[in-house]
């Protein structure tokens, strides 16, 4: 794992902000939700008194005996909010996935569809969503017990695929993505109630420092950073290209990165990155000639299925947020 931090000095242990109610009963803005209110308020018109709120759910709900991850791996996930496993896939299995990815990205009938996201200034497909419904190859991978078992172990319950996609960042042209917490979006716009989801990203090309690898803030999963700005109508049409709403403040980012640093897992194709739904992450532009691609699956716990969105007028389309056991089709 290649590690990049914001400075070379030792990083102190975070002293998390404690979310407490303000003493004034009629306070204009509260520091924490009252009992019965949304525990993770976001897309606010005005900031809270604190830059973040404590996470309420445990990070790891299962134990070593519950799945393939070792006690050391579970401890790392608990502490950092992610783990990286090199050589999770290799050989013919990896080659078959690369071949399928290239075939899907070349589909002209996908171009212009709502589930196919192109570069902000171009026509090249950047992401294909609901890929486990578009491809039998990726459907088998999404439901592979090697992934499902890890998700079940971390979540402490039966998972289902909340979202799937393949991402492609072309050489010299692939744009970056702002810092964000996936849970903030899924809570605000999909109606995911609690932090019982985990993401699995399998790198299908070599990941190195210069081709825009995913960067994460270790330890950031332990707090929730409310974001400012009311969710625009059909926000997903813009946010999947360039996200402007649901982005933490620079103050909060500066404090969290100063305390925890930044890590960017790199390595050969076939590695698996598992990260908590609330871990802050982002990526730089691809400044190298080498493309970067990955397969991405989000596993949500079945008893945490989505309800009405907490900070949007309506839920996002189903290709972005699946229901358990649903049968989605690109043809509706």
Swiss-Prot record:
> How does its activity hinge on pH?
Optimum pH is 8.
Asked whether the UniProt record includes Transport among its keywords, one would answer no
The entry's family comment says:
Belongs to the PhyH family. EctD subfamily.
Chain sites annotated for binding Fe cation: 180, 182, 281
Q: How is the cofactor bound?
A: Binds 1 Fe(2+) ion.
Q: What does the record note on temperature and activity? A: Optimum temperature is 32 degrees Celsius. Active from 5 to 47 degrees Celsius.
List compositional bias (Polar residues) regions by residue number.
1-10
Region annotation (Disordered) maps to 1-47
* Obligatory cofactor(s): Fe(2+)
Q: In this UniProt entry, which cysteines form S-S bonds?
A: none
Q: Pfam families annotated for this entry?
A: PhyH
Locate the residues binding L-ectoine: 163
- Where, by residue number, does 2-oxoglutarate bind? 169
Name the keywords, alphabetized.
Dioxygenase, Iron, Metal-binding, Oxidoreductase
Question: Is the keyword RNA-binding in the record?
Answer: no
Its assembly, as annotated, is: Homodimer.
Q: What is this protein called?
A: Ectoine dioxygenase
EC number(s): the record gives: 1.14.11.55
* Species assigned in the record: Halomonas elongata (strain ATCC 33173 / DSM 2581 / NBRC 15536 / NCIMB 2198 / 1H9)
Which interval of the chain is the signal sequence?
Answer: none
